[in-house]
From Swiss-Prot:
InterPro entries: Globin, Globin-like_sf, Globin/Proto, Hemoglobin_b, Hemoglobin_oxygen_transport. One of its GO terms (biological process) is hydrogen peroxide catabolic process. One of its GO terms (cellular component) is hemoglobin complex. Residues 2-146 form the Globin domain. CDD domains: Hb-beta-like (cd08925). Transmembrane segments: none annotated. It comes from Ondatra zibethicus (Muskrat). The lineage of its organism: Eukaryota, Metazoa, Chordata, Craniata, Vertebrata. Involved in oxygen transport from the lung to the various peripheral tissues. This is Hemoglobin subunit beta. Pfam families: Globin.
Length: 146
């Protein structure tokens, strides 16, 4: 991902303002509600029968925290996303057989949640920078599929 110094600074500054665990839980929950076919990877999470069940599900929240922790790690290694996400790419490709398109969808959910949480601070330029990052992360996670 090619980011300018200004974009990197915006990402770093804004990321420090959010509750990362909350972003992860909300983003994963929204993914499962908005794109219900993604629930097939999480059937062992229990009740996912409605949006309120998904958003209140402790396992969704816990996994959302794992997801966003990995994403936050990527923010520390923006110049090496492929290397940073290599093991996760292998896991999701070889063992979990996740459609790599789902990584793009989740990235979009992260951007939506950041927009909501950051309000006016999430300017169009900030959105552009984060969109580049989530696209780069999705590409890195899909790397083992190619």
């Amino acid at each position: 991902v090619h980011l300018t110094d200004a974009e990197k600074a915006a990402i770093s500054g804004l990321w420090g303002k959010v509750n990362a665990d909350g972003v992860g839980a909300e983003a994963l929950g929204r993914l499962l509600v908005v794109y219900p076919w993604t629930q097939r990877f999480f059937e062992h999470f229990g009740d996912l029968s409605s949006s309120s069940a998904v958003m209140g599900n402790a396992k969704v929240k816990s996994h959302g925290k794992k997801v966003i922790t990995a994403f936050a790690d990527g923010l520390k290694h923006l110049d090496n996303l492929k290397g940073t996400f290599s093991a996760l790419s292998e896991l999701h490709c070889d063992k979990l057989h996740v459609d790599p398109e789902n990584f793009k969808l989740l990235g979009n959910m992260i951007v939506i949640v950041l927009s909501h949480d950051l309000g006016k601070d999430f300017t169009p330029d900030a959105q552009s920078a984060f969109q580049k990052v989530v696209t780069g992360v999705a590409t890195a996670l899909g790397h083992k599929y190619h």
